[in-house]
From Swiss-Prot:
Its main location: cytoplasm. This is NAD-dependent protein deacetylase. It comes from the Bacteria. Residues 1-274 form the Deacetylase sirtuin-type domain. The gene is cobB. The lineage of its organism: Bacteria, Pseudomonadati, Pseudomonadota, Betaproteobacteria, Burkholderiales.
């Protein structure tokens, strides 16, 4: 038996032996849906790190750059559809094997695939919120507002980048118009957790509560370089839970894994979860 078949057989056994699986997914779970990931096989950034919270809140130029890239990128990101990995994980959940699926992604593709008990750890890009009055709204109308205010930008075409942005390096963002909150005139931000921003406590508590009842952990498409997800794997290892990962390249928790499959998530899960 070659190593590929051996890995798949081992993963089938791992999943078959679990009744209360804690699943953690990252950007690699959505690459087959056309959404790029952040890191290379060594866990290093493929491009500049995403904008951080302080920069976004601290100046109009940073917000203009962010919203210009997001507005152009949304046309691609908003049309992304679940791939075989999302559908396979949804099937596991529908069979009652998944206690909670925690995703670091903001694309809502697990829900689109019919997933149950999904926790959006880092929020969701299909909603926006005001940082002053907490007004919230869907991305569709906000996207329309952005495009009306910036018709010359709306015509641009660019390659997709992670988290719904577009590659617009070299552009002059100084004339991009960033609309204000329709209620109070405050700063509007996507309802996602930026770098430098804290994950809401209730989400972290819900994840830890599910982990306490889990009998195994499956990591899908994450290098675990971000502490926000890595901490749950750390806690699982301390509790003696078996941990498996499907990921191309190294993860921060390689020494904690009982099993690792270094192949594309969609291919692997389509084969082991019929």
């Amino acid at each position: 038996m070659d190593s590929r078949m051996s890995d798949l057989q081992a993963l089938r056994g791992f999943l078959g032996g679990s009744e209360r699986l804690f699943v953690l997914t990252g950007a690699g779970c959505s690459t087959a849906s056309g959404i790029p990931d952040y890191r290379d096989g060594q866990g290093q950034w493929k491009r500049k790190p995403p904008i951080d919270f302080q920069a976004f809140m601290g100046g109009q130029p940073a917000r203009a750059r962010y919203w210009a890239r997001s507005m152009v990128g949304w046309r691609h990101f908003g049309q992304a559809r679940p791939n075989a990995a999302h559908h396979a994980l949804a099937r596991l959940a529908q069979r009652g094997q998944v206690d909670l699926l925690v995703t670091q992604n903001v694309d809502r593709l697990h829900q689109a695939a019919g997933g149950r008990e999904v926790l959006d750890l880092h929020g969701r890009l299909d909603e926006v919120r005001c940082m002053q009055c907490d007004w919230r709204g869907p991305r569709g109308p906000w996207q329309h507002t952005l495009e009306l205010a910036n018709p010359q930008w709306a015509a641009l075409q660019a390659g997709a980048a992670p988290d719904g942005n577009a590659d617009l390096e070299g552009q002059d963002f100084s004339r991009f118009v960033v609309p204000s909150c329709p209620r109070c005139g405050g700063i509007v931000k996507p309802d996602v957790v930026f770098f430098g921003e804290t994950v809401p406590r209730e989400r972290v508590q819900r994840a830890y509560a599910a982990l306490e009842h889990a009998d195994a952990v499956l990591v899908v498409g994450s290098s675990l370089m971000l502490y926000s997800g890595y901490r749950f794997v750390q806690a699982a290892a301390r509790a003696g839970l078996p941990i498996a990962a499907i990921n191309l390249g190294r993860t921060r928790a390689d020494d904690m894994l009982a099993l690792k499959v270094s192949r594309p998530c969609d291919e692997v899960l389509a084969e082991v979860v019929p």
